[in-house]
Curated annotation (Swiss-Prot):
One GO cellular component, as annotated: endoplasmic reticulum membrane
Protein encoded by which gene: CYP2A10
Expression sites (tissue/organ): Expressed in liver and lung as well as in nasal tissues.
Catalysed transformations (reactions): an organic molecule + reduced [NADPH--hemoprotein reductase] + O2 = an alcohol + oxidized [NADPH--hemoprotein reductase] + H2O + H(+)
Domain of life of the native organism: Eukaryota
Uppermost EC category: oxidoreductase
Official protein name in the record: Cytochrome P450 2A10
Species: Oryctolagus cuniculus (Rabbit)
Length: 494
């Protein structure tokens, strides 16, 4: 009896030691993480989160735990950074440590770690360097791409004139125009506005982009290991992404058949040439998977973010006709009605520049940023983040940081104007992110936004079917992306 009692005590002691060792190993493995709400097994902090307002849910948690905290999205453990100081400290001051890429489950289903956007830093580094250089070769940042944007703006103006002042949904007018600019770089040509395949591609992009902002999309980010096997809207998003990938693959096959290594026609040609140059290097990142996925990255990002920002911008200007009138006045004074706007005009147009910046700030297109990952055990403030820890840099919390913006929840162009009415930069303006993984299309997007906005407003006044005070500028969805409400408007010739 005594022996069995001693044996039981010994077994309990061993079990206790094993549990303590396991806890110690877990603590060592996960370092000293920031505080956060206690998670439940598998579902994490799901009960404390509202998938219809994920950004607001996380910001509410930050009120209790501070600007750096830990949250569990289902089984995913995430370190969340809020406010300009924390985000800059991580992505700029400790850029190398935070240069990894975290998960975005909807897109990871297709990309699987390939392509310039959703890959690790080791893979992304040579792809980014190549993409930036090649975009420059095809005119980005130069007069060449400015002329391409001006040409496309001309087609858009004619399309709006053809509506004869009728009330229309501007969504696909804008997306096909913006998409044609990046298409001319990656595919070497533009699409006709009525091309059925082109319109189908735009619907696929819009559908999958909007899915990431929906409550179901946010739920999928938490429980994708289960939901990817279930019926639901996520399956439609997968089909749309597959359709986009197949389209890119066809374009690549066409280019392969007609490639002239001495005369690249577009981004795809340039990548194929680089593949040939490095075909004997087994570690090269220049292979077919990265070609298809990087081209899709550029095509998708180069279409949706700018066109959605413009669509939201039109809604804001109809809500604030006084702002629209001031932009019209500045355009008439600086540019007039007899020539197209040029990118260099913005230096003389501080109010228009401020309005465009405020549209980007207010719309807050990617509020939670793309997830990052620390590339090694990293000391951050008083915490120790283990290698591989996922990080959400909350870009929306930077764009709405009250330390930098006096009316963070309002549309207020004066945020970017000094007391003399001159344009004023802000350290908290980072809609394209910052650090090593900043948006590589930032320069192109800035030029597009200025030239498209000024050209459209040079030619038209905006009219809504609602009175300004009745226009709802709150977003339709806020998840990975911010999606404006669907609306109609009239383009009235000036």
């Amino acid at each position: 009896m005594l022996a069995s009692g001693l044996l039981l005590a010994a077994l309990l002691a061993c079990l206790t030691v094993m549990i303590l060792l396991s806890v110690w190993r877990q603590r060592k493995l996960w370092g000293k993480l920031p505080p956060g709400p206690t998670p439940l097994p598998f579902i994490g902090n799901y009960l404390q989160l509202n998938t219809e307002q994920m950004y607001d849910s996380l910001m509410k948690i930050s009120e209790r735990y501070g600007p750096v905290f830990t949250i569990h999205l289902g089984p995913r453990r995430i370190v969340v950074l809020c406010g300009q100081e924390a985000v800059k400290e991580a992505l700029v001051d400790q850029a190398e440590d935070f240069s990894g890429r975290g998960e975005l489950a909807t897109f990871d289903w297709l990309f699987k770690g390939y392509g310039v956007v959703f890959s690790s830093w080791e893979r992304a580094r040579p792809l980014r360097r190549f993409a930036i250089s090649t975009l420059r070769d095809f005119g980005v940042g130069k007069r060449g791409i400015e002329e391409r944007i001006q040409e496309e703006a001309g087609f858009l103006i004619e399309a709006f004139r053809d509506t004869r002042g009728a009330f229309i949904d501007p969504t696909f007018f804008l997306s096909r125009t913006v998409s044609n600019v990046i298409s001319s770089i990656v595919f070497g040509d533009r699409f006709d506005y009525e091309d059925k395949e082109f319109l189908s591609l735009l619907r696929m992009m819009l559908g999958s982009f909007q899915f990431t902002a929906t409550p179901t999309g946010q739920l999928y980010e938490m429980f994708y290991s289960v939901m990817k096997h279930l019926p639901g809207p996520q399956q439609q998003a997968f089909k749309e992404l597959e359709g986009l990938r197949d389209f890119i693959a066809k374009k690549v096959e066409r280019n392969q058949r007609t490639l002239d290594p001495n005369s690249p026609r577009d981004f795809i040609d340039s990548f194929l040439i680089r593949m040939q140059e490095e075909k004997k290097d087994p570690k090269s990142e220049f292979h077919m998977k990265n070609l298809v996925m990087t081209t899709l990255n550029l095509f998708f990002a180069g279409t949706e973010t700018v066109s959605t920002t413009m669509r939201y911008g039109f809604l804001l200007l109809m809500k604030h006709p006084d702002v629209e009138a001031k932009v019209h006045e500045e355009i008439d004074r600086v540019i007039g009605r007899n020539r197209q706007p040029k990118f260099e005009d913005r230096a003389k147009m501080p109010y228009t520049e401020a309005v465009i910046h405020e549209i980007q700030r207010f719309t807050d297109m990617i509020p939670m940023g793309l997830a990052h990952r620390v590339t090694r055990d990293t000391k951050f403030r008083d915490f120790l983040l283990p290698k591989g820890a996922e990080v959400f840099p909350m870009l929306g919390s930077v764009l709405k940081d009250p330390k930098f913006f006096s009316k963070p929840r309002e549309f207020y162009p004066q945020h970017f104007l000094d007391e003399k009415g001159q344009f004023k930069k802000s350290d908290a303006f980072m809609p394209f992110s910052v650090g090593k993984r900043y948006c590589l299309g930032e320069g192109l997007a800035r030029m597009e936004l200025f030239l498209f906005f000024t050209t459209i407003m040079q030619n038209f006044r905006f009219r809504s079917q609602q009175a300004p005070q009745d226009i709802d500028v709150s977003p339709k969805h806020v998840g990975f992306a911010t999606i404006p409400r669907t609306y109609t408007m009239s383009f009235v010739p000036r």
